[in-house]
Amino acid sequence: FQLNGYAPFAWEAPHYQSSPLAIKAVPQYFKTTYQRVVYYTSDNPQTLNASTPGHDFSVGQFFPYIIQKDYYNQRIIPENLGNVEYNICNIDPSSCLTYTAQDILTNATYAQVVRDGFASFFFHPFWLEPEIGTPGYADFQTIINGITALGFTWVDASTAQ
């Protein structure tokens, strides 16, 4: 990255999922993460299967503001609005849910009640590919314009305090 002029400043686990021990290792390399964190009831969960007696739990946590230090010793820039999802069961049988641009904007409206809060979302760039047949570009514009209209200020995440 650095050879091409990029300076990585934060870590985001793929789809926010990694083991508790991996999460604990990240701050050695990246003090900051940019994500909705998944927390576990154990540093070494034996099973997350709900039908197993005594199973461990994992839960994703949305924060409306920066967390300077959490249980895993990471600084967290929050992704708290979610991400657009289209029902593309015909292409990918595991992608059968819908989370709309309006859902993102509804969450941004809710985020306004937090003083100095965030309106941060993730948008998969592949939704912009015309061959997928989704209104990705229009929805992306709707989200940007809607969040701007709500009065949020756009900042470079690497400068977020």
Task: State the predicted function of each range.
Residues 11, 75-79, 121, 147:
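Generic structural hydrophobic/aromatic packing signal, biased to beta-strands
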Residues 7-14, 87-98, 124-134:
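The substrate-binding groove and active-site-proximal loops of carbohydrate-active enzymes
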Residues 15-112:
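Active-site-adjacent pocket scaffolds in enzyme catalytic domains
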Residues 2-4, 27-51, 115-161:
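C-terminal domain-boundary segment and adjacent tail
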Residues 1-17, 107-124:
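CE4/NodB-like, metal-dependent polysaccharide N-deacetylase domain
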